Amino acid sequence: MSRKFKTYYVSSTNGDDCNNGEAPETAFGSLGRINNLELNPGDRVLLERGSVFENQYLHIKGRGTGSDRIEIGAYGEGTMPCIHSNGTGIWYQDYGAPLDSPSHVYKGEVSSALLLYDVEYILVHDLIITNSSPYTTMEEYAAPHKMDRTGIAVVAKNGGTLHDITIRNVWVHDVTGNVYNKHMNNGGIYMTALTPDNEEKTGIARYDGITIENCTVWRVSRWGIAVGYTYQHQKFSGVELDEETFRKYGHENVIIRNCYVSRAGGDAITPMYSLEPLTEHNIADSCAKEMNDSVYRYPEDRMGKVAAAIWPWKCKNARFCYNEVTDTRLNQDGMAYDADSGDGTLYEYNYSRSNEGGCIMFCMEEAVHNIFRKNISYDDLGGIISPACNPDALVTENEFHMRREVPLIRESMQDGTVTLKNNKITIIKEDEK
């Protein structure tokens, strides 16, 4: 006998927690009723459009299946429902081991407006999410041990490989997370993999099937969108990365498309530890806005006052196409694109403009087999190309529209190797800047 799927309705204006929540006329009144449920395959949670859930959060429990996924979305007419968590929804994150640098924080409390913890086969769509805190001084905002915050946090831990997680048409804004913590679930949309309680029993925690599309993320700290920092990071050391390593320890079928990230405190969009991730048709604007001395004041032993816009970390054959990056703020990096410590990164058909740290960096000794082709850079600053200790890179068939005083190779990052071939360089006139 097949189970009947359930739909739960929640309304901040017309609901009541004494209701059964199974029809719009008998909607729950708060998200707390959903947090107490274990969802089953095919179940839906729908929030009424026009609802505002103040000082509330949504932490989903349960799993869908390949044929019957869970859905979190909206119903009715009007504006998308809003979740303003305001520092609620606190959970404890622990990678279970130090990260790839001893300065990186790897455990602590996190506030997440929406948390998917060991959840798979799920679609989240049509929500507005914030997670802000009041502050009156920059000392408060930049406090070194301020709690990490997320708009949407996704965690893999005790479920082995998590499949088919889709986040679509969600607005995440005003997330006042920790200025310094790069690898906690800290920012707009952030996905991680933590050490399982019993890895032999449950399997390696990883993702296969992540889609983030048509999302808007703005005024968040620290990251805009990040997919996949993992407790298995040590498996990815070295130069040429093996595909089987990703299929066992990393992530597969990662897509980030049609998203807009603006005014992130640090980096805008980053797939991590992923095999052939696709990042396309995204826009990043005015990011890395907190990577400066006026905000980044109290890092203590943490380094990391660096950020770029759209880039991969420790990926194999990552592809970036039809993206646009403008006005990334100057820091040690500050460029639009960065092929960072990965194997076979391809940037093609992208556009960059007025990024204070330049257009493209090839970062460090483990950045190999990377190609930057058929892109357009217009009025990027600081130095267009940054070959930073990388063994090789091919830059070909691009258009670089430059100010006369801006160097093609960034002076502080010229220790690597880059091959320039068939690029078009045009000097911008004063009235064209």
Each PLM stretch: what is its role?
Residues M1-K4, L39, R63-G66, K107, ...:
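Extracellular/periplasmic catalytic domains that process cell-envelope and extracellular macromolecules
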Residues R69, G76-G78, E120-N131, G160-T176, ...:
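Right-handed parallel beta-helix
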Residues Y57-I60, I90-L115, M138-N158, Y180-G203, ...:
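Extracellular beta-strand/beta-solenoid scaffold signature
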Residues S12, F28, L46, R63-Y141, ...:
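Right-handed parallel beta-helix/beta-spiral solenoid domain characteristic of secreted/periplasmic
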Residues G32-E38, F53-R63, H84-S85, Y273:
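Short, T/G/N/S-enriched strand-turn elements that build extracellular solenoid repeat scaffolds
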Residues V10-E48, E54:
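Acidic Gly/Asp/Thr-rich repetitive segments characteristic of extracellular carbohydrate-active
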Residues C18, E25, I90-Y92, I189, ...:
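Acidic, glycine- and Ser/Thr-rich low-complexity intrinsically disordered tracts
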Residues K4-Y8, A308:
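Short structural boundary motif marking the start of a folded domain
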